[in-house]
């Protein structure tokens, strides 16, 4: 795989002072690298293919559908509160810079469906943990997480627990 780290742009003080934002758009614009990212994240779950891929708003919406297509799974968006039009299951969560609510349509995940949760970045683990809680509220089974990047110093893995986690690059 190409060295992903070389394609990530740091944006200091975004979205607020003191935060260094990891911009993945510089990696996504390279078609060869994008294909490698999708294949590498997908291949970790090929033996036990999930039924659904849940992509976390917003950059999980970029990776999630491509991984779903690669694995032959359905795609489900996990959106910020108030953005989905039908009845939802929801969970409050904290990030490195805010508190928010995440929602998934109640009919998006059926009982015992195997679910892979996808996002671009694992930081504090708050968003990932909230998404797993919603999947479990809907009686789905979380089979793991897939992230392009991890900010390991923020210890997000501790919040997620014992689920399998695939990360392509740690910072």
UniProtKB/Swiss-Prot annotation:
Pathway membership, UniProt: Purine metabolism; AMP biosynthesis via salvage pathway; AMP from adenine: step 1/1
Keyword set, alphabetical order: Cytoplasm, Glycosyltransferase, Purine salvage, Transferase
Catalysed reactions listed for this entry: AMP + diphosphate = 5-phospho-alpha-D-ribose 1-diphosphate + adenine
Listed CDD domains: PRTases_typeI
Source superkingdom: Bacteria
InterPro entries referenced in this protein's UniProt entry, alphabetically: Ade_phspho_trans (IPR005764), PRibTrfase_dom (IPR000836), PRTase-like (IPR029057), UPRTase/APRTase (IPR050054)
E.C. numbers: 2.4.2.7
GO molecular function, one term: AMP binding
GO CC annotations, alphabetized: cytoplasm
Main location: cytoplasm
GO BP annotations, alphabetical order: adenine salvage; AMP salvage; purine ribonucleoside salvage
Top enzyme class: transferase
Localization per record: Cytoplasm
Subunit description: Homodimer.
NCBIfam families noted in UniProt: apt, PRK02304.1-3, PRK02304.1-5
Function according to Swiss-Prot or TrEMBL: Catalyzes a salvage reaction resulting in the formation of AMP, that is energically less costly than de novo synthesis.
Family: Belongs to the purine/pyrimidine phosphoribosyltransferase family.
This protein's name: Adenine phosphoribosyltransferase
The organism of origin for this protein: Natranaerobius thermophilus (strain ATCC BAA-1301 / DSM 18059 / JW/NM-WN-LF)
């Amino acid at each position: 795989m190409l060295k992903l780290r070389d394609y990530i742009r740091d944006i200091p003080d975004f979205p607020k002072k003191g935060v260094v934002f990891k911009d993945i758009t510089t990696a996504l614009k390279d078609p060869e690298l994008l294909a490698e990212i999708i294949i590498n994240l997908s291949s970790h779950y090929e033996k036990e293919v999930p039924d659904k891929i849940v992509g976390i708003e917003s950059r999980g919406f970029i990776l999630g559908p491509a991984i779903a297509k690669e694995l032959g799974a359905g795609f489900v968006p996990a959106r910020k509160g108030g953005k989905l039009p039908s009845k939802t299951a929801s969970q409050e969560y904290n990030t490195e810079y805010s508190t928010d609510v995440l929602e998934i349509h109640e009919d998006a995940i059926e009982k015992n469906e195997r679910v892979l949760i996808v996002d671009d970045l694992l930081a504090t683990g708050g968003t990932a943990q909230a998404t797993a809680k919603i999947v479990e509220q809907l009686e789905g089974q979380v089979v793991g997480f897939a992230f392009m990047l991890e900010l390991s110093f923020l210890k997000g893995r501790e919040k997620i627990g014992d689920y399998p986690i695939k990360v392509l690059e740690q910072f």
